[in-house]
Amino acid sequence: MILDNINSPKDLKKYSVSELETVADEIREGLFNRLTKIGGHFGPNFGFVEATIALHYVFDSPNDKFVFDVSHQAYAHKMLTGRKAGYFDDSRFSEDSGYTNPDESEHDFFNIGHTSTSIALALGLAKGRDILGKKENIVAIIGDGSLSGGEALEALSVAGSELNSNFIVVVNDNEQAIAENHGGLYKNLKALRDSNGKSENNMFRAWGLDYIYEENGNDIASLIAVFEKVRDSNRPVVVHIHTQKGKGYELAEKDKEGWHWCVPFDRATGKPTVSFGSGESYLGMTSQYIVEKAKKDKDFVVVTPAMPMSVGLGPEERAKLGSQYIDTGIAEEAAVAIASGIARRGAKPLVVTNMTFLQRAYDQISQDVCINKTPVTMLMNYSSFDGLTDVTHLGIFGLAAFTNIPNLVVLCPSSAEEYISMLDWSLDSKQKENPVLILIPGNDVSHRPADKDYDDLNRFKIEQKGEKVAIIALGDFFQKGEAVASAIKEKCGFAPTLINPRFASGLDEELLHGLEKNHQLVLTLEDGILEGGFGQKFASFYGPDKMLVKITV
């Protein structure tokens, strides 16, 4: 295998184009070996193999610097920079994260996992290079889907006006984000593709950037030629290449959305080799709720920043929603502000995404929603330890980040009935005062009778009256609270009080004062971080008193 002899990009340069094509095949075998066994980002990596080879063939990494947007398409880059064991040796899979990581290699310059950041980061590298009087090439690599993010567009604007030196932006255009692209700029990209880059309506040139187009984005020889044209250029330039997402695996080529990311699967059939059970799930429950809600309530509208699958909205469900569905592209700030406007006008918006991405819209939540008290409902998935995949995709900071924003009601359901009741209450026509953030449970589905009305804010619910110890178990951790209560009764001989707080954004002070009569310890359980988290509210409340508080995360 030629790849056995490639331990750095320098080793790549001695091979012919035909041999490099063999290397591309070998890289895809490495991708298959890893992804069939542990899963990961499939389509982005299979579609960018040839471009990665050409980039490393033409440029001189790490002296020349690559910044991969999201970096979920960097697996081939890792194989060519001394990390191929993480793809061919099953025992070493854990050595390579799913994203670029400077701790792994001198060829990686940033920990990246969120989208639309590469152009700004690379622009900073270019400016720093110029200040220090250096001469290397700086290359940002970004997918067409990521261009919908405001940070990417802002950085392109800055590059076109503020930089007069080497700066290369490779736009990997596979005509797809995770789902289909949304936004007017994609009409411009299509016009450029259809005209082989010659359309006069060119947004990149409008920003003051040079531009070159390459239709054959999966042809190594063509890519080498175009990258050689821009190497050592003395002006910012966009290299727009047209690639095929999922190239090399027919199932992925036909279903770009479904194969953006994969679980372990059988290569011959494409079927998952892991079982998720046949029972109900909160994801399935959510998508069903949204579709039925839209059918019954024409004032209801779903807003998502390119993450419809975060709540199980596949192509079929999105088609059913019709005009009651808005995909803003990767634009969390715009999504939240748009939802605030929808709510102010009298309709009922539901913003859906993953918790790790909502933090990008913190200012809009605080300013455009909460200060204005617009009744926007935000529904977040992966807001717990469930589903954590990398340091860049942690949802566990959400409670600390959002529960302290004035006027925001944060609800943490502990059962299916409670979850649906909270959605119903938040989206009810009578509920016009409160912005609401609801965390989708990450546990297996559990069932328990639930209240229908949450107008009495911050009212906790005592599920089991007891003594001495009060267990306050939030959301996903309520099941753990039940287990702790049972263990205390069995081992200590008394029944503790078990409380389902439901609200994470405030305290039930009346209930907490009542606990002081016959309890000596309050134990809080939460799915988040300690500092600034839910439990610290109780430590602060009981600070002047004798009550002991134990916070467990």
PLM features: residue spans?
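N-terminal amphipathic, basic-rich helices that act as targeting or association modules
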Residues: 1-81, 203-206, 214-223, 237-240
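Glycine/charged-rich beta-loop-alpha catalytic/anionic-binding loops adjacent to active sites
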Residues: 29-36, 95-111, 133-139, 314-329, ...
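A short, small-residue-rich loop immediately preceding and capping a beta-strand
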Residues: 38-40, 64-67, 110-111, 134-149, ...
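Cofactor-binding active-site loop characterized by glycine-rich and histidine/acidic residues
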Residues: 41-162, 300, 305, 314-315
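Glycine-rich ThDP/TPP pyrophosphate-binding loop and its adjacent helix/strand module
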Residues: 73, 108-266, 271-279, 283-288, ...
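A glycine-rich helix N-cap at a beta->alpha junction
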Residues: 85-98, 160-179, 370-383
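Non-catalytic terminal/interface segments that mediate subunit docking, oligomerization
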Residues: 249-359, 364-374, 473-475, 490
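Peripheral docking tails and interdomain loops at the edges
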Residues: 267-278, 387-389, 408-409, 417, ...
